[in-house]
Amino acid sequence: MPETERLILRRWEDCDAESLYEYAKDPAVGPICGWPPHQSVEESREIIRNVFTGKEAYAICLKTDNRAIGAIELKLNGRTDMTEREDECELGYWLGKPFWGQNIMPEAVREILRHAFEDIGMTKVWCGYYEGNTRSWRVQEKAGFRYQWTTREVDVPLMHEKRTGHVSALSKDQWQWDRLYAAAAAVRRERTDSEYITCGEVSAAILSGSGRIYTGVCVDTCSTLGICAERNAIFNMITNGEQVIKKVIAILPDGTSGAPCGACRELMVQLMPHEYRSIEIMMDYKKERVVTMGELTPEWWIG
């Protein structure tokens, strides 16, 4: 069952009908998402029984009382027209108005994306919103979704009208790089420990073979004994019993990303002498330019 610090995402039950009706009857909630306000508790119960039946359809509940305050679903192949692939799905969600502005929906979306990519094997998640639903787009933007296209005159059958629809998507690869960048940025803090030592001007994050993220910052000294951020992240990983590296990102002093230094690349080769070529390096985070260690490191350098 997906959950966060504040939330539980659980299956819908008949007893949720009253709570569902309380929030779904609000005209500020459903129409902008493409469905009319609920008219009765009984209608809400029928929707629980006949609509919220998808394998990955969940009620958003606060842990404090387990009461349904919104809905979120990964619409798998057969329940979406955005993709026909078995390893892709569409994300849909809404939240009761009393809970807007509390960062609840971004929290739920982050967890459902983790669930999609790590638990059920999705490689891409699609999402859409209708023109004017800026709250929905902000949630998608916070989660890392990339704009794909706009379609005009889209049928909205439950509202008996046509609208302009916008579509975005997020791949597993993009999601992993976003998490790595955020992890590296979170530990990057330049500081002076003494007149001879400064730390944190450069930070790095590594995605290990197990899917864990390890971070490190650079340690610069007035001698040649400084340690790179990537190397500290690698040592952190080794200390935790791992040695397989999947992805590496280093954030430079100006906030851009760049390649690991020669010494750090040599360490990665030593750790993975037969597989190092497949390690992915983020060269330009904004432009999403990635190279492999094999492309970055010529054979003569290894030999």
Locate each region found by the language model.
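Compact, glycine-rich, soluble single-domain proteins
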Residues: 217-231
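Cytosolic beta-strand hydrophobic patch enriched in CBS
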Residues: 57-63, 205, 281-283
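Short glycine-/small-residue motifs
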Residues: 71, 215-216, 247
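C-terminal binding/interaction regions
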Residues: 177-194, 243-303
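Conserved GNAT-fold acetyl-CoA-binding loop/helix
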Residues: 28-49
